[in-house]
């Protein structure tokens, strides 16, 4: 019985690999929205953040005993008035079995006006997505390698249409207290739509990524690098805002080079004073910057920044993410050490 849970997770993960490609549009893309302030400030996809109870939502291999009785709640004031939230918790079962991690992700798209084919308003409706996850990681004996997996139960509702799905994350992570670097490989959101909105099942938006971090020796700076979307080389989609029109009215699409497309796979983050009670974080998401830039204006899209402040058993994080000149995102996180008494 001691290995039942890890084996169950592995079986579900392999099942989702086999059924990941079904056809149709990709769904449940809300799983790729960063819901923690640490994640958002570091560019939106840092995979090597250590001892952070929110991190296993992105990389289950980072689950560790140091997360025991740690909890976090997160809120994102997302684009266009969309509200995003999540909560996470970890508990050490025992030193032999290891630590279990649980998480909830939620997104509320707000209310929309319903209308018939003639444009006559018939009322309003809402749209919401929910994911509930449970995860586990295992330290490979006599090594500094960790393997982990999440199982996610997914639910979505758009007006009267509902959908349920099952997805999983699989990761491997190298970390040593005696090395300034760490690295990881993760496959996220492999899954299967159990109940479609209508008759045809659709694909879940999965991602294959690798990441690394490096803590500088004489300067209190830690670097994070992520290379994502390895399952799809071509990420370049011409931005209509950057097309050119000549005097004859002919429109020329934005030209995207090999280097431009390659850099869209990269996310860079940096932490200042990463091991102190107060720290600063900055990030740059190359794909976000390329897709949201405007030819006639400096948008600063792709940039993000934030800070963390720890006081006793509590820690507060904030992140600001730049998307567009008219819309930005703020992320708030509160961590609580439930094992610590008093303030």
Task: Tell me what each language-model feature is.
Residues 1-4, 143:
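Positively charged n-region of N-terminal signal peptides that target proteins for export
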Residues 4-15:
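Sec-dependent N-terminal signal peptides
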Residues 21-343:
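Subset of outer-membrane beta-barrel
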